Amino acid sequence: MSKPQVIVHATGELLAAAVAARLVTRLVDAQAARGSASLVLTGGRTGIAVLEQLRTAPAMGAVDWSRVDLYWGDERFLPTGHPDRNETQAREALLDHVAVDPGRVRVMAASDGEFGDDPEAAAADYARVLADAARPEDHGSVPSFDVCLLGVGEEGHTASVFPASPAVYETERSVVAVRNCPKPPPTRVSLTLPAIRRSAEVWLMTTGESKAAAVAMALGGAGEVQIPAAGARGQRRTLWLLDRAAAAKVPKTLVPPLA
């Protein structure tokens, strides 16, 4: 498992543009190596800003989007097309503007879908989706995602794994239903930390002074039960991509000069 690497940008806007450029390079490299790439998307202000920047990135055309397998790290369990669904926001920001293969866009079920208002069934279904997508070389029931994009909440949650919640203790399942979330909407579906840790690279992105304490705790050695984002690690690389405000309380020994 990789150790966290911190990269700080002056502003959130610069961070989103830099992450978009970095992501183009990573996807192109993956496609050159094996013909396809896999990416886990996230929601939230920063996650969607990255997708918007990606849409207009100068090297955007270098990515063959028909050969990108897309997943979600978590989803708000709401009806199809609801504006608060991560899928809806990702489609508006990027996916409706590029030539994706619909069969490779693996969304989490909506609350008006085939499983009705049953997030546990939706979670079990997405676990099956992941298992079906896993290759023999992945050595398990979760694909080895090239990049898993994640946000970080003010209290240290990532995906929809919240501090001291049942999800943070999960060690067997790759996807779980999350009820009674402290942030609305209260019901969600989320990858677990063990599933996230199957990723080759995990990129945690966050901005703003309200995140500074959680970021500092995660990078300062807090456990994942207290700060779930601390448990999100990639097999080969773990990046903490921050703006100056979010990095304000990180020990100076961990923070390089501004990118």
Residue ranges and their predicted role:
Residues 1-39, 120:
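N-terminal glycine-/serine-/threonine-rich phosphate-binding loop
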Residues 2-3, 63-146:
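Ligand-binding beta-strand-loop-alpha-helix segment within the catalytic cores
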Residues 31-58:
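Glycine-rich N-terminal segment of FAD-binding domains in flavoprotein oxidoreductases
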Residues 41-46, 150-154, 207:
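Glycine-rich beta-strand-to-loop/alpha-helix junction loops that act as flexible
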Residues 53-64, 88, 92, 163-172:
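A glycine- and small-aliphatic-rich helix-loop capping segment at beta-alpha/alpha-beta transitions
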Residues 59-69, 98-100, 167-169, 194-199, ...:
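Short, conserved loop/helix-junction motifs that constitute active-site signature segments
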Residues 147-194:
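Class I SAM-dependent methyltransferase SAM-binding "motif I" and its flanking Rossmann-like core
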Residues 194, 200-259:
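ATP/nucleoside-binding phosphotransfer catalytic cores, i.e., glycine-rich phosphate-binding loops
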